[in-house]
Amino acid sequence: MEPVQSAAPQITLTQVSVEPEEGTGNWKILWRVANLNSQPLDLHAVRLPHGQFKSAERRFEPAIVLAAKQDAQFQVFVHCDEPAGLVTENAFLIFQVVRLGEPWRIFARVRVTVKMSGTPVATTELITMQQVGFSGVPD
């Protein structure tokens, strides 16, 4: 059994590939997410709310079920129409997940660098998590 302090879901997140989509500044980005815990993790949704690296919420139906120590890939359509060389700090992927029957939010902070070709490249800098309802405010 894991200690109480490690009850939070733990993941890694990596950008795998990026392809241009129809329309200026639209990209199809493939991500790899890995469950670092010894229990399953269900991914229900992800969104990217930053204005310079943005997508609508993507609901996973059915949920992406990651067994212990397993990884999976998913795609998100992102709008990023920034000039070459621009670095966007504090962009986020915000996941809605369930672990051991409890809802959590996982915040993956990424740094996005726009290459000379205009292609956005995201590097994960920090991943934090927050249990839904911890503050007494319902979801």
PLM region descriptions:
Residues 2-7, 19-25, 109-139:
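Acidic, serine/threonine- and proline-rich intrinsically disordered appendage/tail regions
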